[in-house]
Design a protein with these regions (language model features):
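C-terminal subregions of glycosyltransferases and related glycan-biosynthesis enzymes
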Residues: 151-152, 169-288
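Conserved donor NDP-sugar-binding/catalytic core segment of glycosyltransferases
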Residues: 68, 72-104
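Glycine-rich, basic loop-to-helix element that forms the pyrophosphate-binding segment
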Residues: 25, 39-55, 76
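A conserved acidic beta->alpha catalytic loop
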Residues: 7, 15-24, 64
Length: 288
């Protein structure tokens, strides 16, 4: 991150009182930071909010410790905002890498609307950038969320104006066995349903979501199914996918891979699925 070519970057570093030597590294580069602190916090959202609340730049983003930007990303993002003064948020694509830095997948997104976000079309956080003015209107992260905290914020920012997808890879996100989105995968669904309940209390979102209510509910079950599958709870994932199918068939059928993977695991053929996935990862990373 410190090697980015764009000259006007405000670096804010929030460390949760790490004991792995991170503080010593931070002190080495402390002159590059507008602000830094190493202290205990009450979770990811609170830590990120500490940084967001101190940001002074017109464009704001955050990175978790496992993730990083690709070269020239900041310059490209700045140009997009300058060329599109009416947008409040922009997002690009993401490289998924393992703990060794090897590419395992390329996460390609599409142009989404507020209605798409209400139906849990998820945008990868590391490649998201937004205007500070929009953040000030939307508010900081809700600290009661731990898994879909970013999606909850995107919904609020998208109410402020246009969002734009740029089909370029801007960041890399590291996935490993200890990552939160795998270790506690079953919690994602609970927060998806919480967001649905929250939407009902937001007049502007209720109006935007009035035509997609069934699809949104089915999508929450689909999200639940996807992360239950990641968490190794295949039978629960299958039941969640079936609930999505009952509520809004097209939403469930668009993710038949969840159904197929869950079935393979339930009948004891999960190893076959894993072989296929490993082969796919080798192809993506260029290792035949």
């Amino acid at each position: 991150m410190l090697s980015e070519d764009y000259p006007r970057i405000e670096y804010i570093l929030i460390d949760g009182a790490s004991t792995d030597g991170s503080t010593e590294i931070i002190r080495k580069y402390k002159d590059r930071f507008a602000y830094w602190v190493s202290e205990k916090d009450n979770g990811q959202a609170e830590a990120i909010n500490k940084g967001l609340s101190r940001a002074k730049g017109e464009i704001v983003a955050w990175l978790n410790s496992d993730d990083y930007y690709l070269p020239n990303t900041i310059s490209e993002v700045t140009n997009v905002f300058e060329e599109n003064p009416d947008i409040v948020m922009v997002y690009g694509d993401i490289l998924a890498v393992d703990e060794h830095g090897q590419t395992t997948n390329i996460l390609k997104y599409k142009q989404l609307s507020l209605e798409n976000l209400l139906c849990f079309q998820i945008i990868g956080q590391p490649s998201v950038f937004f205007r500070r003015a929009a953040l000030e209107k939307a508010g900081l992260l809700d600290t009661s969320y731990h898994f879909l905290l970013d999606h909850h914020l995107w919904l609020r920012i998208a109410q402020q104006g246009k969002i734009l997808h740029v089909p370029q890879i801007w960041s890399a996100a590291r996935y490993h066995a200890e990552a939160k989105n795998r270790a506690k995968a079953a919690e994602f669904g609970r927060e998806a349903f919480r967001i649905l309940d929250w939407v009902k209390s937001q007049p502007g979102l209720m109006e935007a979501g009035s035509g997609v209510e069934r699809r949104a509910r089915a999508s929450a079950h689909r999200v639940d199914a996807r992360y239950l599958l990641d968490g190794g709870k295949s039978w629960s994932a299958l039941k969640a996918w079936m609930r999505a199918l009952f509520i809004h068939p097209p939403t469930a059928l668009a993710r038949m891979n969840i159904f197929v993977s869950a079935i393979l695991n339930v009948v004891g053929l999960g190893k076959l699925r894993n072989i296929v996935l490993r082969r796919r990862q080798r192809i993506v990373s260029g290792n035949k």
